[in-house]
């Protein structure tokens, strides 16, 4: 079952809330295909605050929170996403995402922090040049083994809209 609510708070602000509950039944093995157990009740929630024209004209911002409660774990996500138009051809899109997962049946846990920035430049009527770069910090414990990793990425490309 899913329930969603969208509400305009002001000319610049909108609120969005979604709630989903599932309970998938398991299957039995049959004709050589291995069955799987049911999931139990799983709850997925999402809350977003959407804003526009806050800092500069035609900017947009999303602040969001997600929470998932499943049989084996809980997941929390907090994210920020902004988009700024600079002139007619250039867009700047800074983002930040924080994920935390904790096990219910074990002490497993994971924290991921991902700041990224995307830039887009419009060349002509249909061609866009894109650049995206980001960093990831990951701290996790799995089967009582702690591990911290970091990484960077850079993506460049083009996109045509015909």
Name these PLM-found stretches.
Residues 1-162:
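Gram-negative and organellar
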């Amino acid at each position: 079952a899913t329930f969603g609510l969208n509400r305009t708070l002001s000319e610049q602000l909108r609120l969005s809330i979604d709630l989903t509950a599932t309970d998938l039944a398991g299957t039995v093995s049959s004709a050589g295909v291995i069955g799987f157990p049911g999931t139990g009740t799983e709850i997925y929630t999402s809350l977003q605050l959407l804003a526009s024209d806050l800092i500069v004209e035609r900017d947009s911002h999303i602040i969001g929170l997600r929470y998932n409660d499943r049989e084996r774990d809980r997941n929390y996500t907090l994210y920020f996403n902004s988009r700024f138009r600079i002139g007619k051809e250039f867009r700047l899109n800074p983002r930040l995402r924080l994920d935390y997962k904790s096990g219910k049946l074990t002490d497993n846990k994971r924290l991921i922090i991902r700041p990224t920035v995307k830039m887009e430049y419009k060349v002509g009527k249909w061609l866009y040049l894109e650049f995206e770069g980001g960093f990831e910090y990951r701290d996790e414990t799995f089967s009582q083994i702690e591990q911290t990793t970091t990484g960077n990425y850079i993506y460049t490309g083009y996109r045509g809209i015909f």
